[in-house]
């Protein structure tokens, strides 16, 4: 089992949680980004810089993720693709995407995109906060505990 990270937009505090978790449970962590990333020295952690371009990092993750693996992303279309491949998707705020909720998230995303393109000011997501960080850490720990038992 590997953990993949859509790392370009992943908050640094989430990356730090992931670095510690990878070391603790001895699980490969792969950060995929269009730009160079700093990672701590570890046999379990590596960063992969892909070519610049729209969805290049996402496409690399989709092509390489295996069923049962975990992908950390806030990108809803990427989450939908990895779920279709049998992988798990967790966003940096600690919400797991699932077959049950991903279609609704995609429809809402598309609706908001349509509103913005028509000139409507929809605002963005709430600022990332301590509660989000804690929820992410808790969900990640539960997932890793569950997968280590199987």
Swiss-Prot record:
Superkingdom field: Bacteria
Family membership: Belongs to the UPF0178 family.
Name of the protein in its database record: UPF0178 protein HCH_06960
